[in-house]
């Protein structure tokens, strides 16, 4: 029997041969890229790769080796494609996304829409983001109404909640972004501090019914667990809950909303800081109908769909990983009328002008069934 050192020496020799053959193969792959550049052929030929994988894996002398050979060559082919995408980008063959590059966004006299009523957290995010330009704003009843206002030209920008640090994503707004095809041009993160609000003179012992947005109720779950006798009611946002409590004028009704909302609607603060997570925050996106980005933009949001098969998500994300792109966030949403199939949303740190992202997006556009760039904005 050979000792371990002898076996390792043999493996080292084989590994050097593999490296030499790999580099030889990649050189030929580069020549393939040159041919495809000249002829306009696509890099990814799925039928050809599937046929080749089947042929190569059949050469294995056991089920284990056949599986391993297939996996090995899947990786080799994937790297080969990435090299070809890179060469095409270097040759200036890159279909740029339909986005206009601007020096800066102009918010002067902009019409801005938000969902809810006066005092909603969305309005607070709007004011923090737009500052002095926030004067020409108005509210609508639903998030869809806000997106419709952009589509119809009644508003230039909309502000939508997209994610909360405690309750997770606002799934409806992810779906609306895909449906309407609007563009994210900014984001605003605000700290969420919930308070229990009642009509003037109400006491904690009077309360039997609590109103708020479903996510706000979730974010105060531990506090509400201590008051199991209270009936919980969901409304479209926290400000609407405060407005209802004020209009009903009944001492047994309370709202979960912000202190600012209490001031707007003339309610008393019965308890403050009732959210479970004291670092609770919500991320809002700023949306417009024009596909634009600025030179300072440093975050991209995309969504994509892929084949419903083993390893599909890994292969799609590998385009970002291989190009050294740092992912901030990944989320999935079920595809309508296609049970157990999903659309993926990914945020990553980069600008559309970066060659690395151009390589990654080229690969994704060829190897996914659908790719949509939701926006490139400053975070």
Give names to the regions the model predicted.
Residues 1-379:
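Domain-level signature for soluble enzymes in the chorismate/prephenate branch of the shikimate pathway
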